[in-house]
Curated annotation (Swiss-Prot):
Pfam families in the record: Asp23 (PF03780)
Classification lineage: Bacteria, Bacillati, Bacillota, Bacilli, Bacillales
Signal peptide extent: none
Organism of this sequence: Staphylococcus saprophyticus subsp. saprophyticus (strain ATCC 15305 / DSM 20229 / NCIMB 8711 / NCTC 7292 / S-41)
Region: Disordered, residue numbers: 1-40, 144-166
Name of the gene: asp23
Family label: Belongs to the asp23 family.
Protein name: Alkaline shock protein 23
Main function: May play a key role in alkaline pH tolerance.
Length: 166
C-alpha cells in the first residue's frame, strides 16, 4: 500500500493548525514592522570638558593652555573654561584626546602623563561609555608654583583694572 506523503503532511498540518503559508505570512509581517533603534551620542565639547576636568585633578598640572581664542577669552576675564587646552576627536564608540598643559617644576612629566591618561580614560568611559583610544599631552611650559601664582595674580589684577574693579 503506497502512502502519499503530501496527504499525510496536509492532514498533520490541519490537525495541528499549522499552515506553511500562514507561517510565511506571519514571518513577513514581523519583518515589515519597524525595528526600534536608539542612539546615545556626545558633542566634542562634552568630551573636552570631561577630559579637562579630569586632567586638572592630577597633581603637577598647574594649568591647561589654550589656543589663540582661549587666550583672548581669558584676557577678558573668563579663564574658567574647563575645556581650555583640550581638543578631541569623537567617534561613535571611541575618542581621542589632545591636551596642552603647564607642568609644575620638579614633577615627573612621564608620571603625570600616566596619571592623566588613566584618569581621562576612566572618566570618559564612566560618564559616556566611550573608549579613549589615544591621549596626547603636550607640555607647553614648566613653572614653579610661586611663578605660576604670581603670573595669575598679575593677570587677575590687570583684568580687574580693565573692568574698573580695583
Amino acid at each position: 500500500m503506497a502512502v502519499d506523503n503530501n496527504k499525510a503532511k496536509q492532514a498533520y498540518d490541519n490537525q495541528t493548525g499549522v499552515n506553511e503559508k500562514e507561517q510565511e505570512q506571519r514571518q513577513e509581517q514581523q519583518n515589515q514592522q519597524p525595528e526600534f533603534t536608539n542612539k546615545l551620542s556626545f558633542s566634542d565639547e562634552v568630551i573636552e570638558k570631561i577630559a579637562g576636568i579630569a586632567a586638572r585633578e592630577v597633581s603637577g598640572i598647574l594649568e591647561m593652555k589654550g589656543g589663540f581664542v582661549d587666550n583672548i577669552s581669558s584676557s577678558f576675564g573668563s579663564n574658567n573654561n574647563v575645556s581650555q587646552g583640550v581638543s578631541v576627536e569623537v567617534g561613535e564608540k571611541q575618542a581621542a584626546v589632545d591636551l596642552k598643559v603647564v607642568l609644575e617644576y620638579g614633577e615627573s612629566a612621564p608620571k603625570i602623563f600616566r596619571k592623566v591618561t588613566d584618569l581621562v580614560k576612566e572618566q570618559v568611559k564612566y560618564i559616556t561609555g566611550l573608549d579613549v583610544v589615544e591621549v596626547n599631552m603636550r607640555v607647553e611650559d614648566v613653572m614653579t608654583k610661586k611663578e605660576w601664582s604670581q603670573k595669575n595674580e598679575k593677570s587677575q589684577s590687570s583684568n580687574n583694572e580693565d573692568k574698573g574693579l580695583q
